[in-house]
């Protein structure tokens, strides 16, 4: 049985700031169902350790690394049979607040480099069998900058396992000062532009890109995009150089957590073959959010209120859509000026526009089920999960044709009626977004056309089964001595 160590900085339901947490829960479980022994490595955040203690788990080993006392806990990811290892270092990971990266004022923890440097060191020690555990991986799968130093620390070991590094969002690179590089005690040989130096800064993510045996990202389109100056965040040249090792594998979703036929967050359930209760979900959502219960088109948005998610474009189209009678249900948090602009919109349009700041898992499900149209006008989107959730729930998405949105949403102007499941705009402007929403609203008026779009979306396969199989093929080929995904 192939053993995989899946190193991540967040995993649902223990800690979540975005899609990484969902992937880190569902992909390892899918790999286990394929017969892999996939175990997760996670920093020992308070919520994770609390869950471990409540489950009766215990420390497996305790040691000192440099100035830090470290313990390793073995437990299970809640609700699954997947083994979860927790790196318990109170000095670095016992922090207040819900975010693993920021304090309660929204500022990055000053010692994030030290925190995830230690996480990388412990990951490498576990991978090399140096912690006295009766388990050692054949593959170490690292995710985003927080675990990107693990391949660096394994590079000089002759018997190190193969490494895979997945880019979930290239915009987050783990950049720190040269002084921090020195403080971490990293060897001077790594301070070179072809290794960890990036325009005078230490780049954690370059560790994964330069030293891993294979690189993946979360959609085929994003794999192409990040090799261009427009999406490469200064690393496009390196990624073009590594293109033979770079693979775009589309994310899946947990189709048990996201299932309109049995969703515990919904009062009414429905499916592709019996869609009637979707309107009941909408009425309940309108009541919950203080919106008028009527037949008006309801547009939903769930995500971070930041420029990347196209909030400036969205703000440019909300008012004219409200004026024509549309309703909005918005859930998220982010930049202060976007929050204030949306609050003003809610005050101006009571009963028609709702904003819930923060993140609420249950409400996210209810918006996904209750809306007619789901908006994802992202400037860039490595994969995106919300559009797949909305498709599965028969809520027709309107998206910007980038990254994984381009790979999962198919416009009737570009595809056959049998394939079309949403609306795509290509030009990066508010006018293009407005035009796509207008087309969606027009389609909604034609019941047969709308029902076909919903049906196509709901019957799509968004599960991890095939996507996990692509990772499994990559693992097998790495162990066999090459980094191809598809076997001959």
Curated annotation (Swiss-Prot):
Keywords: Glycogen biosynthesis, Glycosyltransferase, Transferase. GO terms for biological process: glycogen biosynthetic process. Pfam families: Glyco_transf_5, Glycos_transf_1. GO terms for molecular function: alpha-1,4-glucan glucosyltransferase (ADP-glucose donor) activity; alpha-1,4-glucan glucosyltransferase (UDP-glucose donor) activity. It catalyses: [(1->4)-alpha-D-glucosyl](n) + ADP-alpha-D-glucose = [(1->4)-alpha-D-glucosyl](n+1) + ADP + H(+). It comes from the Bacteria. The keyword Zinc does not apply. Its EC number is 2.4.1.21. ADP-alpha-D-glucose binds at residue 16. Pathway: Glycan biosynthesis; glycogen biosynthesis. GO terms for cellular component: cytosol. The keyword Lipoprotein does not apply. Belongs to the glycosyltransferase 1 family. Bacterial/plant glycogen synthase subfamily. Synthesizes alpha-1,4-glucan chains using ADP-glucose. This is Glycogen synthase. It comes from Marinobacter nauticus (strain ATCC 700491 / DSM 11845 / VT8). The gene is glgA.
């Amino acid at each position: 049985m192939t053993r995989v160590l899946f190193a991540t900085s967040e995993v649902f339901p223990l800690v979540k700031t975005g899609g990484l947490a969902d992937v880190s829960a569902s992909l390892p479980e899918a790999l286990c169902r394929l017969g892999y022994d996939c175990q997760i490595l996670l920093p020992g955040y308070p919520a994770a350790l609390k869950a471990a203690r409540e489950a009766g788990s215990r420390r497996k080993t305790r040691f000192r690394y440099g100035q830090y006392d470290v313990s390793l806990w073995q437990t299970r990811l809640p609700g699954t049979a997947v083994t979860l290892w927790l790196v318990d270092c109170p000095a670095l990971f016992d922090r207040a607040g819900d975010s693993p990266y920021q304090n309660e004022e929204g500022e990055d923890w000053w010692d994030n480099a030290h925190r995830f440097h230690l996480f990388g060191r412990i990951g490498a020690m576990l991978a090399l069998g140096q912690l006295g555990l009766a388990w050692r991986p054949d593959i170490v799968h690292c995710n985003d900058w927080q675990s990107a130093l693990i391949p660096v620390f394994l590079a000089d070991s002759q018997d190190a396992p193969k490494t895979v590094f997945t880019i979930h969002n290239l915009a987050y690179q783990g950049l720190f000062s040269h002084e921090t590089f020195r403080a971490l005690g990293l060897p001077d040989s790594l301070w070179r532009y072809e290794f960890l130096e990036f325009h005078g800064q230490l780049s954690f993510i370059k560790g994964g890109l330069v030293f891993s045996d294979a690189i993946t990202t979360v959609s085929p389109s994003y794999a192409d995009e990040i090799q261009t100056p427009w999406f490469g965040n200064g690393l496009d040249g390196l990624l073009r150089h590594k293109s033979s090792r770079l693979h775009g594998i589309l994310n899946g979703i947990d189709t048990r957590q996201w299932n309109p036929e049995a969703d515990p967050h919904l009062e009414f359930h429905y499916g592709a073959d019996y869609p009637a209760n979707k309107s009941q979900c909408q009425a309940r959502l309108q009541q919950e959010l203080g919106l008028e219960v009527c037949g008006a088109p309801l547009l939903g948005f769930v995500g971070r209120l930041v420029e990347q998610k196209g909030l400036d474009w969205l703000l440019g189209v909300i008012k004219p859509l409200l004026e024509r009678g549309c309703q909005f249900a918005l859930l998220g948090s982010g930049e202060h000026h976007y929050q204030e602009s949306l609050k003003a919109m809610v005050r101006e349009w009571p009963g028609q526009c709702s904003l819930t700041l923060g993140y609420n898992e249950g409400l996210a499900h209810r918006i996904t089920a209750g809306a007619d149209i789901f908006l994802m006008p992202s400037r860039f989107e490595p994969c995106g999960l919300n559009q797949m959730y909305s498709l599965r729930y028969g809520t027709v998405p309107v998206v910007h044709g980038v990254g994984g949105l381009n790979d999962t949403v198919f416009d009737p102007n570009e595809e056959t009626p049998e394939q079309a499941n949403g609306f795509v705009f290509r030009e990066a402007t508010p006018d293009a977004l407005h035009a796509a929403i207008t087309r969606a609203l027009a389609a909604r008026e034609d019941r047969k056309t709308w029902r076909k779009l919903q049906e196509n979306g709901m019957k799509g396969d968004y599960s991890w089964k095939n996507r996990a199989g692509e990772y499994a093929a990559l693992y097998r080929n790495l162990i066999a001595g090459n980094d191809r995904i598809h076997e001959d």
